[in-house]
Amino acid sequence: MRIGLYPGTFDPITLGHQDIIQRALELVDRLVIGVAINRDKSPLFALEDRVAMVREECDRIVAKRGGEIVVHPFENLLIDCARDVGATVIVRGLRAVADFEYEFQMVGMNRAMDDSIETVFLMADARRQAIASKLVKEIARLGGDVSKFVSPTVRDALVGRFAR
């Protein structure tokens, strides 16, 4: 069984993330969505909320197109998480050249720690390239409409968070 790991903070999960998830499902038998706890970031949503949102969106994807998705929160090194879930491939989405520079460094470090785990890059769909969780949160914070960037469930969570 080919297991892939798609890691991220998913704060919140966007339509861009969902596009990568759907396409990654075509490449592996099981896709693990690693919801990261990153001490260098201050997430808007608690880990439990992010996991719940990711799980809900992934359940919709599986119901619509099949496949197997597991949502797995993690706090350790990405390469250790990949080993923990039995992944042989790490899936990363790229939106722009700036993403590639960072990802290129990460691949080098991960390969130095375990060269048996491959990294695969999926280019963001042209319609989704501009979507970034950080920008979505800013638009929502300022009262803008984020429905072109996130699902209705995530939109409602953002509206609820900023209505406080």
Curated annotation (Swiss-Prot):
Q: Which organism is it from?
A: Paracoccus denitrificans (strain Pd 1222)
Q: Which reaction does it catalyse?
A: (R)-4'-phosphopantetheine + ATP + H(+) = 3'-dephospho-CoA + diphosphate
Which NCBIfam families does the UniProt record give?
Answer: coaD_prev_kdtB, cyt_tran_rel
- Tell me the Pfam families matching this sequence: CTP_transf_like (PF01467)
Q: List the residue ranges forming a coiled coil, or say none.
A: none
Alphabetically, the GO molecular function entries are:
ATP binding; pantetheine-phosphate adenylyltransferase activity
The Enzyme Commission number assigned here is: 2.7.7.3
Keyword Chloroplast listed: no
Residues recorded as binding ATP, renumbered to this chain, are T9, F10, H17, G93, L94, R95, E103, R128, Q129, A130, I131, A132, S133, K134
Protein name (database record): Phosphopantetheine adenylyltransferase
What are the binding positions for substrate in this chain? T9, K41, L78, R92
| Family recorded in the similarity comment | Belongs to the bacterial CoaD family.
Q: Which InterPro entries does the record cross-reference, listed alphabetically?
A: Cyt_trans-like, PPAT, Rossmann-like_a/b/a_fold
Q: Which GO terms describe its biological process?
A: coenzyme A biosynthetic process
Q: Which domain of life is it from?
A: Bacteria
Query: Subcellular localization, per the record?
Result: Cytoplasm
| Subunit structure, interactors included | Homohexamer.
Q: Does the keyword Transport apply?
A: no
Summarizing the function annotation, the protein's role is: Reversibly transfers an adenylyl group from ATP to 4'-phosphopantetheine, yielding dephospho-CoA (dPCoA) and pyrophosphate.
